[in-house]
Amino acid sequence: MGGVLSLSPMVDVCRTPSFNRLEESYGEDGYLSAVMGTAFVKGLQQGDLKKGVGACSKHYLGYGGGGDADEKEMMEDILLPHETMIRLAGCKALMPGYHAVHGTKCVANSEILNDILRDYLGFDGMVVSDYTAIDQLPGLDTPLQKAVAAINGGNDVDFPRGENYQYLQEALDKGLVKKEVFERAVKDVLRYKIRAGLMDKNPYLYSTEDVKLDTKEERQTAYDIASQSIVLLENNGVLPLVKEADVNSAKQVKNILLTGPNANSIWAMCGDYSFPSMFYFWQSWKKKWDDSHLPHIVKLLEAMQASKPEGINIKYSRGCDWTEEIETKFEESGDKRAWEYQLLHRKVDSGEKADKAEALAMAKESDVIVAAVGENVMLCGENRERDGLKLPGKQEEYVEELLATGKPVVLVVFGGRAQVISKIAKRCAAVIQAWYPGEEGGTAVADILYGKISPSAKLSVSYPNTEVYEPICYNYSTRQDARVEWPFGYGLSYTTFAYKNLQAVKELSTASESSNIYFEVTNTGKVRADEIAQVYLSPTQSNQQIHPIQLQGFARISLNPGETKRVCIKFYTDQFGYYSHQGNRQWNIAPGTYELKIGASSQDIRLKQQIVLTGDKVVKPLRDHYFSEVIR
């Protein structure tokens, strides 16, 4: 098994809630996306492309809602993940998006590929087009013209088959491409091959050892990732379903109905471009297929039955399907296989009958209803764009009928992006956003429902309460957007936390490198749990150049009931800075008064302190430091 290049990670700063590829991203915040993307690259590459697998930063620049951003937002937020993956993690491959920036498609955009990427950031890696992106360049009639536009614009490799770049010799002969431009592309590719060891006398291409996949340790990692990513949005006290105080009492929940299209489904467990999802996606037109070679995907029904506490009875009825006629629109542009798929498939087939009458009858006999709803890999992903952000099909109407039984409804929402559920959410006893939780996702959701673990994740997006098709982001204002139901950074727990004793310098020189921040977090409840404390920075005057509020750090803290931990975070002075372009592109750290904020979300700030930056304005081409560091 081996490989020298992975077309990941996708670090688009996704500020449009309806974006069909949001599931692949790290959300709407540039800082968070940069932290996660940089860690991804370091882990994948292992510090040496000859030993690790090369990462590819994509989709450069502004795919997912940032392509129309002004220069300041583009350079401070949208560029940031690509910048840190290149400068801090050594990412040596980059993929431009299909979209346009300032009117020019990214794959042929010299401003972003040559001026910003190479000249400003110093990138010396390889630029590869997204699949067929060069084919789709508008206003150009021939492959020769498209190849000329792309290579002059800064693109090195024509993916997937080089159909346009085969004409580059003709372009050179006709003087349409300068020799130095052609040599740049060739050198970029050769340089990558050398770094990956492909030019060595005996290149290391793959391991000859037996590779064991899907091991016990890997399943545990998958479980940990899932359990730390599931967000509790609402809870009136019904969760956890099993409470220590209620055991052996009349209050103990005994009969649970599990229902909904995602209750017993593999389609909503793994997101787009994960191997199981892609296998099922392309094999689904067959009546039968062999998936015995795939990792076992734990569905919610299986997990709830396998781990149910003594005395609890699980009943199951699907009750509702995603949709009869498939809602997804497949665009003819992009991956041509998806267009072919539209011709082959007209329905998301669950292979299981949905009997609403049966489910509603079971609901009336149950103590609690768990409704597993949302999207699936057929309804969200690249080239799959459905109408609206409400629950697909008649799922909302079905939940209304479940609510009408008078029994408490726990809504578990699966999918790669937020769904507009504001009409029903507040009337549900609890709401869980499970996303695409992976192969151990069913186990993680079940353990949270039963109270074996406490939910701890926070939202990486602003969760909308209405259909939103334009960019929204928490850092546009300190006030919560009226279109947002739950804010960025929000997430409930089965316990409560108190924040206290913030200690930070009150005055700091612009020439200083860093200072430490201290604060304490206490678990004031009765359940062991994790809290994700968040550090934000805000200006105190309207003429300051930084965002009204901006995430600048976070720390996951595990606490037993009654336990207090002191957190120390190193905060770099570069984090007070802002971008400007006054003849030269530069990073500025200006004197002034700023407000440091510690909170449980972007709208739940628990501690504040003003910090005065003194001294002269510091100007540098690029930041020396990007991220705060958790010391303890």
Give the predicted meaning of each segment.
Residues 1-580, 586-598, 602, 625-632:
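Glycoside hydrolase catalytic-domain context in secreted enzymes
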Residues 604-620:
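Short beta-strand elements
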